Amino acid sequence: NNKFVNSILSIGELSLPQKLSLYLKIMSKGNINAFTLQQTEEVKKFLENIPSFPLDVSIAAYYLNINNITYGQYLKYLNDYNQEIENAQEDILKEVGDYTKTRYQIITLSLQQIMASHKDFKDLLLFISLFDSQNIPRDLLNSYKDKIIVDNFIHHLKKYSLITHELSSSLPVFSIHRSTQAIALTYLTKTLNLEKNKKTLEPVISSLEKYMADTLEKPSILLIKLFVSHCEV
């Protein structure tokens, strides 16, 4: 019931120092002084590309510790997400604890629940999976679906911790972690059979063309720059 749902503990995102501390403790088995200053700086740069949740940081640490691969190779695995990396991560989780749900499983379950909430949310999920994951303008979604639907959609994305808001921006925008977006696109491509159903993308293209025309008519350099960054993707 609703009382039970509202009582569930929500684990927020970790700060970079928290991510670093967790990663180093796992990699060095508690002896964080085992890393040199240069190695620590390299870890920081690596962790900037890892979703800021304990599960993601833990899996990254255990995976690199067991397989002895480079940071670049691991990030490539995340970007080229497939069933093999999914199985490998699940095996690692089984070895280190009783929890076996990987990031892919968590995100796809969240996507399923979001799509079940409203008939238009499936279209909006696909829509935001096709652009640059950073600084997506709210107006871009408003040009595709009704504003009330978009507001509700954003609420659901935030509810499942799939997005972050850029409070410092002068325009209402939000961002998705790149690996989260990659997982979403992989899942939606398979679920919607996009390889064969190319017509599914036609409304997206039509909406994008309209938004482009409207944007170019507005005297906002920032808005135009944002739009160009998404077109380049």
Write out the residue ranges for each language-model feature.
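Aliphatic-rich helical/repeat scaffold segments used for oligomerization and domain docking
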Residues: 1-233
